[in-house]
Amino acid sequence: MPDVGTARCDFPGGDASVLFKSIRKLLSLPPETRLFMCHDYPPSERDVRFETTVREEREQNIHVHDGVDEERYIEMRTNRDRGLAMPVLILPAVQINIRAGHFPPAEDNGTAYVKIPLNVL
C-alpha cells in the first residue's frame, strides 16, 4: 500500500535491486490497472486494504513513487532493513518457503513439525 511502502529485502534471497525492477515493471502498466496485494500492515488509523492502482502507487508510494531511482531505493531499503527486528514468524516461514510452500514430511507419529532452534536466537 502506498502509505506503507514496499517489502523488506533482508530475507534469504532478498535483493532490493530485483524488487525495485519488478515494481517498476508493474508501475509501467496503465494508471487505472488494479493491483491486488497479498498482505497489508496498516497503520492504526486505517483499515486493512488489499487493492490499489498503478496511479496511486506511482503518485503516493512512500518508497517507489515516481522520481525515486534505483540507487536511492536500494540505499533506503538497505538502511531501513538493517534497523528492523527479525520478524516473529521468520523461522517457520523460511522453513515453509524453502520447500515451495509444502510442509515438512510427517515424523514417525504422523505429525509434520516446523522446528525452531531454542539456543540460537
Q: Residue locations for each model-derived region?
A:
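Generic detector of bulky aromatic hydrophobic side chains
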Residues: 3-10, 36, 40-44
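His/Asp/Glu-rich metal-coordinating catalytic cores
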Residues: 1-20, 24, 53-57
